[in-house]
């Protein structure tokens, strides 16, 4: 008996040109893959970080060098960074040198010692010779009588550092944010730039944004005391970092909340608190501290400042997911204390900012957030903390902020910052 045929099945025969085409395509794909692999292993640039130590015999160590943002520290750091910039920008590594940064000053019996972090980007194929080449360049230049820097022979010259630790150090300087000026308004619903305000954080309860805060140290925030009127237990709070609330850069739990001893919920004075995080954050281009001004810092009326936050875009309006910013002006306390403005309610611990014409202002949900000003070196300082006001953007009712300089010593007493 014959076996019945299987319906629809027949033998396929590949034509020679089909086999050739398939083989060629496979070989081409393999060649591309090998090419990419070779490029990655040989030509792709890799970042390298080296720590170097130098001796400066011409300068005597002073306690001012350990004081953050002191004039002596700022000037010496800039002088050293400029010297390293010139050395490498005029060398065979000029296309691979990225930047340098002074990490620390140390006392020496005969001068000052400085620890410096140097960043390079170089193809992988040349990575093996980078350290020796950089070492040779530095040695040659520093032996010159024109250089005020000398090699610190007590330590290995160039010590490689891992990327995470190095980036943390490179971004540890305060106040590095938006390049001023830039125009955007909370009232228009325009979001802030991606790395504009890297100290801004969100204080949340059960994942809901309630207040803003500013990062002033790897484990410390400063914010408004009234943010904790209803929720005083630190365990209820979490902190979110990053430009968007829905996709945070990182989060932390809260270890403790320190509210100013004289704060009372029924008044606006002493509206300041500091928050200690459960663990330190790792600094990056998107996560940095804002600078704190000294208690003697003065700001003039009409000075341009920025306030940022995730507050309502207008009175009783929607809340954004992306961080918003608005540029406003400092208004003197005398003007804000006029009868038709706030009628004497503004104390020396407060600062007034906005416009008497209204429109541009902080709003509900911005409480605790930063009011910042830029200096001539493009460093941003925390002038105020969003505290209170009447409505949002109302005529003759500008925003009122806690004056940070007034509480500078209090902040230092609680955080050692």
Curated annotation (Swiss-Prot):
Keyword Protease tagged: yes
Tissue localization of expression: Highest expression in lung and tongue. Also expressed in brain, colon, heart and liver. Isoform 1 is the predominant form in tongue whereas both isoforms are expressed in similar amounts in lung. At the cellular level, expression is confined to epithelial cells within the cleft of the circumvallate papillae extending into the ducts of the minor salivary glands, the respiratory epithelium of the nasal cavity and tear gland ducts.
Cytoplasmic side: 1-22
Active site feature: 226, 271, 367
Domain of life: Eukaryota
SMART domains: Tryp_SPc
EC number(s) reported in the record: 3.4.21.-
Localization per Swiss-Prot or TrEMBL: Membrane
GO molecular function per UniProt: serine-type endopeptidase activity
Transmembrane segments: 23-43
Membrane topology: Single-pass type II membrane protein
Gene Ontology, cellular component aspect: extracellular region; plasma membrane
Extracellular side: 44-417
Chief location of this protein within or outside the cell: membrane
Record domain SEA: where: 46-165
Keyword field: Disulfide bond, Hydrolase, Membrane, Protease, Serine protease, Signal-anchor, Transmembrane, Transmembrane helix, Zymogen
Span of domain Peptidase S1: 186-416
GO biological process: proteolysis
Principal EC category: hydrolase
Disulfide bonds listed in the record: 211-227, 336-352, 363-392
Family per record: Belongs to the peptidase S1 family.
Protein name, per record: Transmembrane protease serine 11G
Gene transcribed to yield this protein: Tmprss11g
